[in-house]
């Protein structure tokens, strides 16, 4: 009996240790306003559960997110962190999309130093296989996927106009004679593996105030700021929709872990088949896959915890307590 008791005690301690480690790592996303983007965050939370991620989802929200939407996210097991907006200097040239200006507020996530490492995912992303292993990447770097210059949002850039894309640089040679040196490697900021750090956070806020805003807002800024420590990772971790019709030879959807529904009309909760390329069968299939996850009630936080508790009571109890505790702690606003 004594030996059995000791074995159980060791098992409990092991589970407690795992739970303790979990709070040092988390996924994080960003939400602003009172529109329907909360649906994307709910879909992401349920997608992470479906692939059995071991880590929670933190939602950095601006004060203008309605209480109703906050309660929906809490009910889905999300950890809410209210943050204050970050406003860059005035932009006299304009952004690719007018709403991009609010995305500078994402810089606040570097302040979340209760976590040693985080994976940022935009709210229009879905995870179709477990990517927890990215938390084990070597420290000291920022990891992200190289962007595709073939999206329509790049239409005003030289890259788009000449058909050059860093995803397939061999297709179109960069004309050094007329355009000078090719552009540096450039990542899509919809998915980032990063390490929160107060010194970095304070410097980000300082530098952004003396940096002239450019076309892609915070994405341009982050690319410039982290150019020395950026490490590319495969596009399977952030497949932007344009890759499907621009570089199909490089895509095997069965091997893709993360889909970024960023093309015009592609967001599943407001899907518009009349937009260019949205009548493609592969796009419709990916939209359906998102809805299958969103509408799966077994992936709702309450139902998921109840199911897991039957399979592993100790882990389920720890996970439930961990989320509740973090929610209570993290309701205080975060601001510099």
UniProtKB/Swiss-Prot annotation:
Gene Ontology MF term list: inositol 3-alpha-galactosyltransferase activity; metal ion binding
UniProt xrefs under Pfam families: Glyco_transf_8
Positions annotated to bind Mn(2+): 122, 124, 260
Cofactor: a divalent metal cation
Active-site residues (renumbered): 106
Broad enzyme group: transferase
Gene Ontology cellular component annotations, sorted alphabetically: cytoplasm
TM stretches of this protein: none
Superkingdom to which the source organism belongs: Eukaryota
Main localization (coarse): cytoplasm
Record-linked SUPFAM superfamilies: Nucleotide-diphospho-sugar transferases
Record-listed E.C. numbers: 2.4.1.123
Intracellular or extracellular location(s): Cytoplasm
Function: Galactinol synthase involved in the biosynthesis of raffinose family oligosaccharides (RFOs) that function as osmoprotectants. May promote plant stress tolerance.
Protein family membership: Belongs to the glycosyltransferase 8 family. Galactosyltransferase subfamily.
Name this protein carries in UniProt: Galactinol synthase 6
Species of origin: Arabidopsis thaliana
């Amino acid at each position: 009996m004594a030996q059995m008791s000791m074995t159980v005690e060791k098992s409990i301690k092991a589970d407690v240790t795992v739970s303790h480690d979990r709070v040092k790592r988390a996924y994080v996303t960003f939400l602003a306003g009172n529109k329907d983007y909360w649906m994307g965050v709910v879909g992401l939370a349920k997608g992470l559960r479906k692939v059995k991620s071991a880590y929670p989802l933190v939602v950095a929200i601006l004060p203008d997110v309605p209480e109703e939407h906050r309660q929906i996210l809490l009910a889905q097991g999300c950890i809410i962190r209210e943050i204050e907006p970050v406003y860059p200097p005035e932009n006299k040239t304009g952004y690719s999309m007018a709403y991009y200006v609010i995305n500078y507020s994402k810089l606040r996530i570097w302040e979340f130093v209760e976590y040693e490492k985080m994976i940022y995912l935009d709210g229009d992303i879905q995870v179709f296989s477990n990517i927890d292993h990215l938390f084990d990447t070597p420290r000291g770097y920022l990891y992200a996927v190289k962007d595709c210059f073939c999206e329509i949002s790049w239409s005003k850039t030289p890259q788009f106009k000449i058909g050059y894309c860093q995803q397939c640089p061999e297709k179109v040679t960069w004309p050094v004679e007329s355009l000078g040196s090719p552009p540096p490697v450039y990542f899509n900021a919809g998915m980032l593996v990063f390490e929160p750090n107060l010194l970095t956070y304070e410097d980000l806020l300082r530098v952004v105030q003396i940096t002239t805003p450019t076309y892609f807002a915070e994405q341009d800024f982050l690319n410039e700021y982290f150019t020395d420590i950026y490490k590319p990772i495969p596009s399977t971790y952030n497949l932007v929709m344009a890759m499907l019709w621009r570089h199909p030879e490089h895509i095997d959807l069965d091997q893709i872990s993360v889909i970024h529904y960023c093309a015009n009309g592609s967001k599943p909760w407001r899907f518009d088949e009349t937009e260019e390329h949205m009548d493609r069968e592969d796009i419709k299939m990916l939209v359906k896959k998102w809805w299958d996850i969103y509408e799966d009630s077994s992936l709702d936080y309450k139902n998921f915890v109840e199911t897991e508790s039957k399979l592993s009571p100790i882990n389920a109890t720890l996970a439930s307590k961990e989320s509740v505790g973090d929610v209570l702690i993290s309701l205080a606003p975060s601001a510099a």
